[in-house]
Each structure stands twice: as structure tokens, then as C-alpha cells.
């Protein structure tokens, strides 16, 4: 299949943006209502219920919710663990609108978190911003992965970045191009891709920030910024 097939039309991009708008509204709702004692499963169920209420056709993948050290597993399956004050909450979610997927991850603090955790968060934040800035049409996907990976390594956390930098999003949640170190894929104008660096320290902490961008624009599709949010109840 030709690479150009994975560049998105104006209509396809509009569906992706509409889906992200729903996800943004769900995220706003969660930030406004989350309370200590809710379980990961309960929060996942609430998120998916709100997605449908706000107009989603369905979820684009099983929603990930991880509290505290559980977030050190990138594809954690929500459990009965309850939310405690002073830990991170990681949410990875997306919906389908018009047959097009969306994909979005944020990590926020529920109460005050440790200084080291904030440091890790801000490294991921800065590295993601660099990745978005450096994403250009007609570059190799692996070149973007190297930029992101090298920056995390330079900051002392390279061994804790244990997945790829990103992937294409469209009719499939994971599609061409794949932004990883062994990729031969090309980034072309109007492709929709994720930039999603993370740092995962087993048994301690996990942070991921993920946004979809349109190649050639260097802008997040989501309205949400990435400065650390601290929710206090």
C-alpha cells in the first residue's frame, strides 16, 4: 500500500478532531470530579460512559487507567486499586467518530506528589514538546524516535523509556507510520501521528504524555496543555 494512502483528507481530519474534542470534554469532567477512593476500574467505566454520552460511536481501544506505581506498566489493565492522595493518575483514552480513531494520554497529580516524580513529569513534558517541534514531512520515522530517545537518555532516563515514540492514527488506532528505532516508515504531510514519550520505573512511577498531531503543523489536536495539573480535593 502506498505511503500517501495514510495522509488524511480534510474530512478524515475533521472526524479525528471531533473525536478528540469529545475526549477533551471527558478529561475536563474527570479533572473536575475525581475523588480519593475511586478504583481504576470505576474510573475507567465512568470515562467510557461519558464518552458515549458525549457522542462517541465507541472507544477506539480499551481505556487505560493507572494509579501510582501501576502506571509504570505502559499497557496496565485497570484494577481494583483505589486512588490515594499524593500519587499520579495516568489515563490513556480515545474514541471513534466517522470511522476515525483518536488517541490521547495525560498524567496528572492527585494531591502533592514527590519532588522526583515532578522532575520525571517535566522531563517527559519537555521531551514531548521537542518531538512535536522536530516532526517534519519527509523525514524518517526512526529519525524522530532517535531525537526523542536521545533526549530522554541525555536526561538520565533512557533505560526507562520502554516503548516507541508514536504511531499513525486513522481507521486503525495503530497504523503506518510507526515511529520507532527500527522503522523504515516515512512521515508525510497530513498524516496524523502520536508523539508519546514516557518514563516507567517499575514499582515506583510511570508518566506518559501523548498527543496526536497533523504532520506539517507541529500542533497538538487536543486543546489540553501539558503543564502538570495538581488536583486537590
Q: What do these predicted ranges mean?
A:
Residues 1-233:
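Active-site neighborhoods and metal-handling regions in enzymes and metal-associated proteins
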Amino acid at each position: 500500500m502506498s505511503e500517501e494512502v495514510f495522509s488524511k483528507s480534510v474530512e478524515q481530519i475533521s472526524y479525528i478532531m471531533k473525536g478528540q474534542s469529545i475526549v477533551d470534554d471527558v478529561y475536563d469532567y474527570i479533572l473536575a470530579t475525581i475523588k480519593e477512593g475511586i478504583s481504576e476500574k470505576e474510573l475507567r467505566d465512568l470515562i467510557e460512559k461519558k464518552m458515549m454520552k458525549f457522542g462517541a460511536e465507541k472507544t477506539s481501544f480499551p481505556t487505560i487507567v493507572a494509579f501510582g506505581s501501576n502506571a509504570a506498566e505502559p499497557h496496565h489493565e485497570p484494577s481494583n486499586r483505589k486512588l490515594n492522595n499524593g500519587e499520579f493518575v495516568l489515563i490513556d483514552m480515545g474514541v471513534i467518530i466517522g470511522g476515525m480513531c483518536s488517541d490521547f494520554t495525560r498524567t496528572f497529580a492527585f494531591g502533592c506528589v514527590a519532588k522526583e516524580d515532578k522532575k520525571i513529569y517535566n522531563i517527559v513534558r519537555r521531551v514531548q514538546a521537542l518531538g512535536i517541534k522536530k516532526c517534519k514531512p519527509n523525514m524518517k520515522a526512526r529519525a524522530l524516535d532517535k531525537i526523542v530517545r536521545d533526549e530522554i537518555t541525555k536526561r538520565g532516563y533512557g533505560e526507562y523509556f520502554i516503548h516507541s515514540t508514536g504511531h499513525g492514527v486513522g481507521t486503525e488506532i495503530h497504523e503506518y507510520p510507526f515511529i520507532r528505532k527500527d522503522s523504515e516508515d516515512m512521515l508525510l504531510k497530513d498524516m496524523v501521528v502520536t508523539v508519546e514519550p514516557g518514563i516507567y520505573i517499575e514499582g515506583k512511577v510511570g508518566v506518559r504524555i501523548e498527543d496526536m498531531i497533523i504532520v506539517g503543523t507541529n500542533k497538538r489536536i487536543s486543546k489540553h496543555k501539558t503543564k502538570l495539573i495538581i488536583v486537590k480535593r
